[in-house]
Design a protein with these regions (language model features):
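Core nucleotide-handling region used for phosphoryl-transfer chemistry
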Residues: 1-28, 33-38, 42-316
Length: 316
């Protein structure tokens, strides 16, 4: 898939695209959303054959910033927090002939990190130089602008030997929890789909026949207004909307997502908090052959993001 925005299931149906309903019943892979910042891309630049680091600007069509040297980092990011982050990434991330993207969590030396809104608590002080949560791999034949994204769901795909100092100490602490669909028993494997939601999904398909869906342009406006309601803590009341049947259907899909989310679990990850409150995670991403969708509690994180002084404008 191209490097496109991943949507919530309920937002994806506004135009009448019901792909997500069948996707819930497909074999899927789950990954845990990590609330890190900034997003870092690294790997081998197919255009030059050189190792690089950068932000998502490496994919820009025009203002491209692919940092292959320390001098380029200083030129483009000198005097900003990104200078230190990218410099450490250039020095510490293992060289690879592949291309990855991950969320930067912080520098070693602490046991608690709050890169954005969520605080992550590790069981002991992090000894590695940097902490990275990889989530995406890209394939690009000749130019990063043509990169195609694939979810990185394999637990810890990076060999320890690829990120160690000569004395055996580590450069990078990888954070990639193992996510799974709970089957009601103890263990880390669970089910491979949300098949137990089949009756609800079939009901939703029947309900869809009576809904007047909207154009992509209209859907964008609906999303904007729905996000505003969620951020401001307002209840989404279908009867406040001209197309009340569409909003009722949106709420139905949102409830199916909540049921799916209640079945998601993960292991091998740090504890997560918002303030003093322990939470499961920021959420999950469901990956299927039909696409990927976000599974998360929008109300919880929109409020937290909106209240976070690091954000000028939050998006659900």
């Amino acid at each position: 898939m191209k490097n496109t925005h991943i949507e919530h299931p309920e937002d994806s149906i506004l135009t009448g695209d019901l792909t997500v309903l069948d996707a819930f019943l497909m074999v899927c892979l789950l990954s845990v959303k990590i609330d890190g910042a900034p997003a870092i891309v690294w790997g081998t630049n197919p255009a030059t054959g050189n190792f690089f680091v950068g932000t998502k600007s490496v994919f820009n069509k025009k203002k491209i910033r692919i940092c292959e040297t320390q001098e380029q980092i200083i030129e483009w990011y000198g005097g900003t927090p990104l200078e230190e982050i990218l410099s450490c990434c250039l020095c510490n991330l293992p060289h690879t002939d592949r291309i990855f993207q991950g969320d930067f969590i912080g520098f070693g030396g602490e046991s608690e990190y709050t890169p954005n809104t969520i605080t992550y608590q590790f069981p002991s002080v992090v000894q590695e130089e940097i902490i990275m949560a990889p989530h995406t791999e890209y394939v690009a034949k000749s130019d990063l602008r043509d990169a195609v994204a694939y979810p990185l769901c394999k637990y810890n795909p990076f060999p320890a030997s690829a990120a160690t100092n000569p004395d055996g100490s580590y450069f990078v602490k990888w954070v990639q929890p193992k996510a799974y669909i709970w089957d009601g028993a103890y263990g880390e494997y669970g089910k491979d789909s949300f098949a137990e939601l089949r009756d609800l999904i079939n009901f939703a398909k029947v309900r869809a026949t009576g809904v007047e869906f909207v154009s992509p342009k209209e859907a964008a406006q609906y999303k904007k207004e729905l996000n505003a309601c969620i951020r401001e803590g307002e209840t989404v009341n279908p009867y406040d909307w001209e197309n009340s049947d569409l909003i009722k259907f949106w709420l139905l899909i949102k409830s199916i997502k909540a049921d799916a989310l209640s079945l998601c679990r993960y292991a091998h990850g740090p504890n997560a908090y918002i303030g003093q409150d322990r939470i499961d995670s920021e959420g999950y991403v469901m990956h299927t052959e039909s696409g990927s969708w976000k599974l998360g509690n929008r109300e919880l994180f929109s409020h937290a993001n909106f209240a976070n002084s690091k954000f000028v404008c939050a998006s659900a």
